[in-house]
């Protein structure tokens, strides 16, 4: 039987112009085998039918709570607003264009409780309009050295003990973290000695169309350098780990038309390294 007596899980979802995929994403949460959950939906000032769809979802399932931002606040601030409304002792994530496997929350919760980890994530399969084109996993055990290289947790799969998330006051709302809210959070937690673990199962499907790689520009890459540098200092990382600050500079120089090929090669190498 699903471990529903472990406690209420609040699933946070911030949506901006997510009308085409929102219902499917929400349904993948509300049909979980783990039944003791609620879905907190934030419409981050969308200009499409997102709010109307949210109203329909809430009318059909009392476990869905919905609200609107008057202006577009961005992911970090919107998730903090979701957290303020959440009732659960555990906090999970979900993105509006992704799909959770039906047992994702149950299996991740079981792993979280059995491992004693402060938070947990799982592996993902990556799809676009042509179908699944990649799978990704990170090692179960994570160190500060690994975090210095990259964010080793897939943000929309993360499940936190609420106290862990609140110990660092949730997500940063700084403009510098607008594309790196998750990495910033992981680094701030690691600076406090709090590092999660990865369940070695693929339980989540991430939608990544080719245009997803165009969201980062030179400015966001420079912001990423600042976030990384601040995180390295906070974690007390050795000087040798600062070499990884070069990565955002390199990515900023890659022609946009080549980005997907570069990312695919990166994920292939990452998958090979993970299996070692």
Regions found by a protein language model. Name each.
Residues 21-23, 48-56, 99, 103:
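Acidic helix N-cap motif at the loop->helix transition within catalytic regions
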Residues 27-36:
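Short, acidic, metal-binding catalytic loop of nucleotide-sugar glycosyltransferases
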Residues 43-52, 71, 95:
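A conserved acidic beta->alpha catalytic loop
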Residues 50, 78-79, 100-105, 130-131:
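Acidic donor-diphosphate engagement hotspot in glycosyltransferases and nucleotidyltransferases
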Residues 69-86, 107:
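Glycine-rich, basic loop-to-helix element that forms the pyrophosphate-binding segment
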Residues 91:
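Short aromatic/hydrophobic "clamp" motif used to bind/position activated sugar donors
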Residues 103-134:
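Conserved donor NDP-sugar-binding/catalytic core segment of glycosyltransferases
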Residues 142-219:
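Conserved nucleotide-sugar donor-binding catalytic segment
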């Amino acid at each position: 039987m699903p471990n529903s007596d472990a406690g209420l899980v609040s699933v946070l979802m911030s949506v901006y112009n997510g009308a085409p995929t929102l219902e499917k994403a929400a349904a993948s949460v509300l049909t979980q085998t783990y039944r003791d959950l609620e879905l907190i939906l934030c419409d981050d000032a969308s200009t499409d039918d997102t709010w109307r769809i949210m109203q329909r979802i809430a009318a059909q399932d009392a476990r869905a709570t919905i609200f609107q931002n008057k202006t577009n606040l961005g992911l970090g601030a919107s998730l903090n607003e979701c957290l303020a409304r959440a009732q659960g002792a555990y906090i999970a994530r979900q993105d509006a264009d992704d799909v959770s496997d039906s047992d994702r929350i149950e299996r991740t919760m079981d792993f979280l409780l059995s491992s004693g980890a402060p938070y947990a994530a799982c592996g993902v399969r990556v799809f676009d309009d042509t179908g699944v084109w990649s799978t990704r996993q990170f090692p179960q055990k994570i160190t500060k050295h690994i975090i210095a290289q990259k964010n080793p947790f897939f943000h929309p799969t993360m499940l936190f003990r609420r106290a862990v998330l609140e110990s660092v006051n949730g997500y940063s709302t700084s403009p510098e973290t607008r594309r790196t809210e998750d990495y910033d959070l992981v680094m701030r937690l690691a600076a406090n000695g709090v590092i999660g673990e990865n369940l070695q199962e693929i339980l989540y499907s991430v939608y990544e169309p080719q245009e997803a790689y165009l969201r980062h520009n030179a400015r966001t890459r420079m912001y990423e350098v600042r976030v990384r540098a601040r995180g390295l200092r906070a974690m007390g990382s050795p000087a040798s780990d600062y070499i990884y600050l070069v990565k955002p500079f390199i990515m900023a120089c890659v022609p946009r038309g080549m980005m997907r090929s570069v990312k695919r090669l990166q994920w292939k190498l990452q998958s090979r390294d993970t299996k070692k």
